[in-house]
């Protein structure tokens, strides 16, 4: 076994309903879309079931064509993977040599570091309060690769175009994770046209509500996209996943209405949380809300009351932080009552 593997902490996904077999719980931990898929997606899935014994076409040409229409980029600028997580792994595999400098501003998504460590990279974790990233601090590291997240997980805030631009001008490569961007309408994806070293990651798990299907994509230079395609799993995205993803892209009107409902509910939830005096509530551009709790054992006490929320202290935050997925209105109201009872 490689020595580096012994030092890697496994990714911690938090608690799941399966961890509570004797209790009915509401999962507000994983930033999932609480609404059912569109009718077109459900029908596409049912049609695809009969193809489960078959491999999907390995180039995923139909999916890439649909993504090209959605993003406005050429097919040659798109790489696909079994969730954005596979693409993070592929990016590290094609870009990083041993001891290359990687910068991961914190607090942020912990999976970036796992795949960078597997490449034996030299990783720096500068901490920026509230994820207010300082490009000058990053530039001092002279990085080969920088991972940025906007809106950031877990803080929920977006990075400005100016910050992304400055980082792209100082780093050899920049990954901009936009898994939650459809909830903010503040995408920097057009910057790929001006910066060949910028890789924008997207996911079908959040806005499109296909977390169980595992589909992600990257928009980047044709050279980087081709390299990613060389090393990704050849059949990593299942046939049903391909068909449901394409159907989701055809159902944009439905998903925009769902998005608008989630955003309205997010703002209402934020105001309700602010009424609880022992919570410090942060603004959000995503489908979750970060709060700092001034009481011990909040995650455990909420679990006892039937709610799973994410302990965000494992994501580079110091103190008692919890991340709450924006659920349906009735679930959010029950959560507020549970918090008031603590």
From Swiss-Prot:
GO-annotated biological processes: L-histidine biosynthetic process
Protein name: Histidinol-phosphate aminotransferase 2
Cofactor: pyridoxal 5'-phosphate
Short name of one Pfam family: Aminotran_1_2
Root EC class: transferase
One GO MF term attached to the UniProt entry: histidinol-phosphate transaminase activity
Coiled-coil residue spans: none
Pathway(s) served: Amino-acid biosynthesis; L-histidine biosynthesis; L-histidine from 5-phospho-alpha-D-ribose 1-diphosphate: step 7/9
Keywords, in A-Z order: Amino-acid biosynthesis, Aminotransferase, Histidine biosynthesis, Pyridoxal phosphate, Transferase
Keyword ATP-binding applies: no
Similarity remark: Belongs to the class-II pyridoxal-phosphate-dependent aminotransferase family. Histidinol-phosphate aminotransferase subfamily.
Catalysed reactions, semicolon-separated: L-histidinol phosphate + 2-oxoglutarate = 3-(imidazol-4-yl)-2-oxopropyl phosphate + L-glutamate
Family annotation (NCBIfam families): hisC (TIGR01141)
SUPFAM superfamilies assigned to the protein according to its UniProt record, in alphabetical order: PLP-dependent transferases (SSF53383)
EC number: 2.6.1.9
Modified residues (N6-(pyridoxal phosphate)lysine): 206
């Amino acid at each position: 076994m490689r020595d580096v593997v012994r030092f890697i902490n496994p990714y911690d996904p938090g608690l799941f309903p399966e961890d509570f077999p004797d209790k009915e719980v509401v999962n507000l931990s994983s930033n999932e879309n609480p609404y059912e898929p569109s009718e077109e997606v459900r029908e596409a899935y049912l049609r695809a079931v009969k193809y489960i014994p078959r491999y999907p076409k390995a180039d995923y040409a139909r999916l890439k064509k649909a993504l090209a229409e959605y993003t406005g980029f050429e097919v040659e600028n798109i790489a696909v993977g079994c969730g954005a997580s596979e693409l993070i792994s592929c990016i590290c595999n094609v870009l990083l040599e041993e001891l290359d400098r990687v910068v991961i501003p914190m607090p942020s998504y912990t999976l970036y570091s796992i795949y960078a460590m597997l490449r034996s990279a030299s990783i720096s974790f500068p901490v920026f309060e509230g994820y207010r990233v300082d490009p000058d601090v990053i530039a001092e590291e002279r990085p080969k690769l920088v991972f940025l997240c906007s809106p950031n997980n877990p803080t929920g805030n977006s990075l400005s175009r100016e910050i992304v631009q400055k980082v792209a001008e100082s780093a050899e490569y920049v990954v901009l994770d936009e898994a939650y961007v459809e909830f903010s309408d503040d995408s920097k994806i057009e910057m790929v046209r001006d910066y060949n070293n910028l890789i924008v990651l997207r996911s079908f798990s959040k806005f499109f509500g296909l977390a169980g299907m595992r589909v992600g994509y990257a928009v980047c230079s044709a050279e980087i996209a081709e390299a990613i395609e060389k090393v990704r799993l050849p059949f990593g995205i299942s046939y049903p996943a391909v068909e449901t993803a394409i159907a989701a892209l055809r159902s944009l009107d439905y998903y925009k209405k769902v998005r608008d409902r989630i955003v309205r509910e997010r703002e209402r939830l934020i105001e309700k949380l602010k009424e609880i005096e022992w919570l410090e509530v942060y603004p959000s551009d995503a489908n979750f809300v970060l709060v700092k709790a001034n009481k011990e054992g909040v995650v455990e006490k909420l679990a006892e009351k039937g709610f799973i929320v994410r302990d965000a202290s494992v994501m580079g935050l110091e103190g008692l932080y919890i991340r709450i997925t924006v659920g349906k209105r009735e679930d959010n109201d029950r959560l507020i009552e549970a918090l008031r009872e603590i």
